[in-house]
């Protein structure tokens, strides 16, 4: 009678106008998903591909963040943050932790820890000794050399120990400053004296005043028995013998404060005058022997020579001149003369060629002195460039405006080592464009971002992806490029085997692009199937210029470790001087990829693959019996260990194998087959 009335359940209708457009399933035989939307499929494919690497010694240094209280394990801070931190230091190894270092370990030490380099290269390759900053160099037995002229200090010691000889620093700095030749360094003697006096007069635990001049002195190693000059950066301390007891807490705290100050405020380096002496190998000292360098000629200038090029960047870009990319004037390029710009083409307004002597970015150096003799080594960076300074420099080369007002319908279609790629539509024309978005704060080497803009803007070719515009949007660099709907060559070679006509067609297009770029002095340094894009009608274009470098008559060689491990040339891995020949080797690896479906040693770890590429004979095809003799000969011309014997792009264009080149339409069935496999069950 008084029963509660049941609520009437709402009726839910079936979907109206429903269309089942996407059907995704899992193929157990292939072990992968099929029918995924393109943007999902591209993300999965990208995650499985090896990422490019850059020289760890060239990683962009960033501004120090405010200190935070850190508690490791059960150790509690005692007498404030500094004392607690010093208490934790006793539990850490200097080798295993970089937390308290002003700089990262040398690239050689990191490479040895990965098994990347053998000890034999230290004595045989003197140029490798010049790849790291002066304050980080070690003797052949791995002992850090302190700045008092070479006294070894063991790894178990604290870096940058307490000064013990107060009078050495001013005298050494004064003598060094007085020897400076270029006009812009007159007065450096007084600055160095002020800096030395400031560092010495500070009581234990007190930081030097921030008004001190922030330029230090560094010099490169010269001659097999020449001195390692003193450095304003790290003082003139003499290292304690490894067997001595630990310093007192007060001494440790004072030393740490000094190190923190130097890492924050004294990370800049001045330069020394040029010298005609030739760099030699490091001294062969014993682990416990003292190093007493004789006083000889002045070290070579660390200022960049007149009109010389950055170590890893195109001509005129805002990038460092580093000792790892020093040139050898005796070795000339075998390609066409490489100049800073296209013949007959004037530098565009606002281009890096116009501004390169005025703007500084990450790891930039002092303006180049036209009076410095050719052949002088490039120097250390003048200091940490702030994020705002870098943005201001980048703003000089990009287009003005906000692309968000011009674009809509963003869809993420890929992700790379420097950023993400989205597909967008232009509002005014309806044209689809690819937008590469790169966060400036998340770059290993942010100065390489200039390559994305400058090279693609200044060097246009039928077989190079066209760049429309570039913008600075907040903290990101946006590069608008043409969208190639055929996708990357990787998608095809991992699914389908190409015949020789199709391989020849791809190689001919890539070689046309490389011949053009090499004639302009541009090294791509990341040739692989991921960098080759296709249109729906079968045209082939080269993309991904984020790791390229520019060479010229002044700097005809490079030396940085840049590229993707499985495609790297042996001379890149061994840190030898190299030029455009490295792209030819990488193209040869890509040919193996098109025949076998993957590059050589792909089942090995990247480090192991790099070892084998460096030390073993050139890799061979797994399915060599399936290819013609002319293709094998074409491949052997590219995979030659000696760069001087390796064929150039122009020579390969005349090879008989490329007579099999077909029309772009011969690649269309491959594109259609891949699209069909990824869109249906």
Swiss-Prot record:
Residues 201-212, 268-278 have a biased composition (Low complexity). The active site is at 526 (proton acceptor). Residues 26-406 are annotated as: Linker. Its EC number is 2.7.11.1. Selectively expressed in brain and testis, with lower levels in multiple tissues including prostate and breast. Residues 308-333 have a biased composition (Polar residues). Changing residue 566 to F: Complete loss of PAK6 activation by MAP2K6/MAPKK6. Autophosphorylated. Phosphorylated by MAP2K6//MAPKK6, leading to PAK6 activation. Residues 12-25 form the CRIB domain. GO terms for cellular component: cell junction; cytoplasm; cytosol; fibrillar center; nucleoplasm; postsynaptic density. SUPFAM superfamilies: Protein kinase-like (PK-like). The modification Phosphoserine is found at residue 560. Residues 407-658 form the Protein kinase domain. It comes from the Eukaryota. This is Serine/threonine-protein kinase PAK 6. It comes from Homo sapiens. The gene is PAK6.
């Amino acid at each position: 009678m008084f029963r509660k009335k049941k609520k009437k359940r709402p009726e839910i209708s079936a979907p109206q106008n429903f269309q089942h457009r996407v059907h995704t399933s899992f193929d157990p035989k292939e072990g992968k998903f099929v029918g995924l939307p393109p943007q999902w499929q591209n993300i999965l494919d990208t995650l499985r591909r090896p990422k490019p690497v850059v020289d760890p010694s060239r990683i962009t240094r960033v501004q120090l963040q405010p200190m935070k209280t850190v508690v490791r394990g059960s150790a509690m801070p005692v007498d404030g943050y500094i004392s607690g931190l010093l208490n934790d230091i006793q539990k850490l190894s200097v080798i295993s932790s970089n937390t308290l270092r002003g700089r990262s370990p040398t690239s050689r030490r990191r490479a040895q820890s990965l098994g990347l380099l053998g000890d034999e290269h230290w004595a045989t390759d003197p140029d490798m000794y010049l790849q790291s900053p002066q304050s980080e160099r070690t003797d052949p037995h791995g002992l850090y050399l302190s700045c008092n002229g070479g006294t070894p200090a063991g790894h178990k010691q604290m870096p940058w120990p307490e000064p013990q000889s107060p009078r050495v620093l001013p005298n050494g700095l004064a003598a060094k400053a007085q020897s400076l030749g270029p006009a812009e360094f007159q007065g450096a003697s007084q600055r160095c004296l002020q800096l030395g006096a400031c560092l010495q007069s500070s009581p234990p635990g007190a930081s030097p005043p921030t008004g001190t001049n922030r330029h230090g002195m560094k010099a490169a190693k010269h001659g097999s028995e020449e001195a390692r000059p003193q450095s304003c950066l790290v003082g003139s301390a003499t290292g304690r013998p490894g067997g001595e007891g630990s310093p007192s807490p007060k001494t440790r705290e004072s030393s740490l404060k000094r190190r923190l100050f130097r890492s924050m405020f004294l990370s800049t380096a001045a330069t020394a005058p040029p010298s005609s002496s030739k760099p030699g190998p490091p001294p062969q000292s014993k682990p416990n022997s003292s190093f007493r360098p004789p006083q000889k000629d002045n070290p070579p200038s660390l200022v960049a020579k007149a009109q010389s090029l950055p170590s890893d960047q195109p001509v005129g870009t805002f990038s460092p001149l580093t000792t790892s990319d020093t040139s050898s004037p005796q070795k000339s390029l075998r390609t066409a003369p490489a100049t800073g710009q296209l013949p007959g083409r004037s530098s565009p307004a606002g281009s890096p060629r116009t501004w390169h002597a005025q703007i500084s970015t990450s790891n930039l150096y002092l303006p180049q002195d036209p009076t410095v003799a050719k052949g002088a080594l490039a120097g250390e960076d003048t200091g940490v460039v702030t994020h705002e300074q870098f943005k201001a420099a980048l703003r000089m080369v990009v287009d003005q405006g906000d692309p968000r007002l011009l674009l809509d319908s963003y869809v993420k279609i890929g992700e790379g080592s420097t950023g993400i790629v989205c597909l967008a539509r232009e509002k005014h024309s309806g044209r689809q464009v690819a937008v590469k978005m790169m966060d400036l704060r998340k770059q290993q080497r942010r100065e390489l971002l200039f390559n994305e803009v400058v090279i693609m803007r200044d060097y246009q070719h039928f077989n190079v992806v066209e760049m429309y515009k570039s913008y600075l949007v907040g903290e990101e660099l946006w590069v608008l490029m043409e969208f190639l709907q055929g996708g990357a060559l990787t998608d095809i070679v991992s699914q389908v085997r190409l015949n020789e006509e199709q391989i020849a067609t791809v190689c001919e297009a890539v070689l046309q692009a490389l011949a053009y770029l090499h004639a302009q002095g541009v090294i791509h340094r990341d040739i692989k199937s991921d960098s080759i894009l296709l249109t729906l009608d079968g045209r082939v274009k080269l993309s991904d210029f984020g790791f390229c470098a520019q060479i010229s008559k002044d700097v005809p060689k490079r030396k940085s470790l840049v590229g993707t491990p499985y495609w790297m040339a042996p001379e890149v891995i061994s840190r030898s001087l190299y030029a455009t020949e490295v792209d030819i080797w990488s193209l040869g690896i890509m040919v193996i990829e098109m025949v076998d479906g993957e590059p050589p040693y792909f089942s090995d770890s990247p480090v192991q693959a790099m070892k084998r590429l460096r030390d073993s004979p050139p890799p061979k095809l797994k399915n060599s019996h399936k290819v013609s003799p002319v293709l094998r000969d074409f491949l052997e011309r590219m995979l030659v260990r000696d760069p001087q014997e390796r064929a150039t792009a122009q020579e390969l264009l005349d090879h008989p194998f490329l007579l099999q080149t077909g029309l772009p339409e011969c690649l269309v069935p491959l594109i259609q087959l891949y699209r069909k496999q990824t869109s249906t069950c």
